[in-house]
A protein has these predicted regions:
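Glycine-centered flexible beta-alpha turn that most often forms the glycine-rich phosphate-binding loop
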Residues: 40, 70, 166, 209
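Glycine-rich loop at the start of a catalytic domain that most often binds anionic cofactors/ligands
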Residues: 79-95
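Structural motif
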Residues: 61, 65, 161, 328-329
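N-terminal small/glycine-rich loop or linker at the start of catalytic domains
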Residues: 29-48, 107-141, 170-178, 294-301
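Beta/alpha (TIM)-barrel catalytic core signal, keyed to glycine-rich beta->alpha loops juxtaposed to Asp/Glu
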Residues: 2-26, 59, 78, 88, ...
Length: 366
C-alpha cells in the first residue's frame, strides 16, 4: 500500500519544480491542494491489458509533464481504470519521480463495476448476509447508493488504487436515481451516504468528497434530474455538526457545446438563482470539469472566431477546446482522457500557455 495523501506543502512543491516547463498559471490552489488546471481522466477504452498499458504510460507522462490531478472511478473499464492508476503510481513513486503527497487522486462510486451487473450485484450484496441491501436499492439496473454499498466500493477502490487515502471521492451520477425514486427518498439516501463519507474522512480513507454528475447541476429546478446544491451542502453540514463538512467538490461537464454550468441559472443560493459553477463558488464547493473537449466531437461546428481567439498558435481544435474549458472562471481543473502518447504530448503544450483571464473569457462567450 502507498501511504500518504495530497498535502498543501508537497502539491505546491510539485508546482514549483515544474516551473521550467509550465507556467505558474497552470496551477491553482483549492481545498488545501495546488493542482494543475488540466487533470488526466481514465474513462474511455476497453478493459484489456493493451489499454491498461496505454493508460498507465499516459498517466506517467502527464505527471512528469506538469499534471498532478488524476481522475478515475471504480466502474471505468470495469475497475481497470483504477488498477491502471495503481500501476502508474507504483512506477512514479518507485522511480522517485514524484511523491504520493504531490498528487491529487480522485475516484468515484455508485455504478456497478462488473459486466454481469444485476447478477453480480445480487450475488455480492443482496444474497450476502454481510450486507443489509435489498433489490430496491439497485436502481435502473446499474446504480446503487446504499451506504453499505458505497462503503464497500470505497474499500475496493482503495485496494484497486493501492493507496491509503483517496483525496477526493465522488458519489457518481446520483441523479441516475431521480425520476425513479421520489425526491424525498433521494435526499434521504444522499444523507445516509454522506454520513458514511464523513466517517471515511475521519478515518483517513478520504480527504474530501463530492458529487460527480452529468445532468444534476446543469438542468433547471423543474427537471426531474435536478440536484439542489444548496440543499446538498446543508445536508453535509448537518451531518458534520459543529466541525466543517468534507463535501467540498462537484464534477460536471463543461465544454464549448455544454455551457449550462457557466451560463444557465439552475441553482438557488441565498434567494438568487445562479449557474452551477457560480453557485458552487459561493457555497465553498470546488468545481471540476468533465468532458472538457466533448470527446473532441463536433468541434468544427463552433464559430471560427472562437476557435481563432482560443488558438494562440495552438495546433489543433481539441487543444483550443481544452484551453476554453480550463479558462472557465471559478473552475479548478478541466479533465481530459488520454491514452495515446501523441495526445499526452499535445495536451501538455497547454501547460506553457496561460489560460484566458475572466475578461477575455467573458468577451469570448458574450
Amino acid at each position: 500500500m502507498i501511504l500518504g495523501k495530497a498535502t498543501a506543502i508537497k502539491t505546491k512543491y510539485y508546482a514549483e519544480r515544474h516551473q521550467t516547463e509550465c507556467l505558474l498559471e497552470n496551477f491553482r490552489e483549492f481545498n488545501n491542494f495546488t493542482a494543475s488546471s488540466i487533470g488526466i481522466g481514465t474513462y474511455l477504452g476497453s478493459s484489456d491489458s493493451a489499454i491498461d498499458d496505454l493508460v498507465t504510460e499516459a498517466i506517467i507522462k502527464s505527471v512528469k509533464g506538469g499534471i498532478n490531478l488524476i481522475d478515475t472511478a471504480i466502474n471505468y473499464r470495469y475497475q481497470h481504470g483504477e488498477m491502471s492508476v495503481k500501476k502508474a503510481l507504483l512506477k512514479l513513486i518507485e522511480s522517485k519521480t514524484v511523491s504520493r503527497e504531490e498528487l491529487v487522486i480522485c475516484s468515484k462510486g455508485g455504478f456497478i463495476p462488473n459486466r454481469e451487473r444485476e447478477e453480480w450485484f445480487k450475488r455480492e450484496y443482496i444474497n450476502n448476509s454481510k450486507f443489509n441491501i435489498q433489490g430496491t436499492d439497485l436502481v435502473a439496473g446499474v446504480h446503487c447508493m446504499h451506504p453499505e454499498y458505497i462503503q464497500d466500493q470505497l474499500e475496493q477502490s482503495l485496494m484497486n488504487l493501492g493507496i491509503e487515502t483517496i483525496d477526493v471521492y465522488y458519489l457518481h451520477n446520483p441523479e441516475t436515481q431521480l425520476g425513479i425514486i421520489s425526491t424525498d427518498e433521494f435526499y434521504g439516501r444522499l444523507k445516509a451516504v454522506f454520513s458514511v463519507l464523513e466517517k471515511a474522512a475521519d478515518a483517513g480513507k478520504i480527504t474530501a468528497y463530492g458529487i460527480a454528475t452529468w445532468q444534476g447541476f446543469r438542468v433547471p429546478p423543474t427537471d426531474a434530474k435536478h440536484i439542489d446544491l444548496s440543499k446538498t451542502k446543508s445536508i453535509a453540514q448537518e451531518i458534520a455538526g459543529g466541525k466543517g463538512d468534507r463535501f467540498q467538490f462537484i464534477q460536471l461537464p463543461v465544454n464549448l457545446a455544454m455551457l449550462e454550468a457557466v451560463v444557465s441559472p439552475t441553482q438557488f443560493v441565498d434567494g438568487k438563482i445562479l449557474p452551477a459553477i457560480t453557485a458552487a463558488n459561493k457555497l465553498g464547493v470546488n468545481a471540476i470539469a468533465s468532458a472538457s473537449i466533448a470527446q473532441a466531437k463536433n468541434l468544427k461546428q463552433f464559430p471560427q472566431k472562437i476557435m481563432t481567439a482560443l488558438g494562440q498558435g495552438l495546433k489543433k481544435d481539441a487543444l483550443s477546446a481544452l484551453q476554453f474549458t480550463r479558462s472557465v472562471p471559478g473552475l479548478c481543473s478541466a479533465l481530459v482522457g488520454m491514452k495515446s502518447p501523441d495526445h499526452v504530448a499535445e495536451n501538455l503544450t497547454l501547460t506553457s500557455v496561460p489560460p484566458l483571464d475572466a475578461a477575455e473569457f467573458a468577451e469570448l462567450i458574450g
